[in-house]
Amino acid sequence: MKTSSFYLTPGEVSLKTWEHLWREGTLAEIDPSAKARVDAAAKLVAAAATGDKPVYGINTGFGKLASVKINADEVKQLQRNLILSHCAGVGDPLDEDAARLMMLLKINSLARGASGVCWDVIIMLQHLLAEGIIPVIPEQG
């Protein structure tokens, strides 16, 4: 696996740095100091998923179904269905540099600690980038 040349601190990355990452294909990783925020948010989401209190999008339906509480044994399926409902797109694929930058932007966004993902998701996405495994992303969708 390739090693990164520098760390990104979520919320502190300049536009110039993003442009450099896009144009030069430089590898970057999230600063490990972000892990505490990510872990704290993941614990909150895990507690909400198993708790009795309805939390929108975690253990309730979406949109008009927001008032529908999902049973604890169906929460994982709800989240899987949400991902599958967004797995469609049309148009030509974006170029690889744009797709790579989008992955970096997503990793940086997740590392801010507001999404509730676990740190392992961020590490896995970084590993994929380091190995040159870039998704095909359609222009729309």
Q: Across the structure, where does each feature detected by a protein language model lie?
A:
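Conserved, well-structured ligand/cofactor-binding cores
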Residues: 1-141
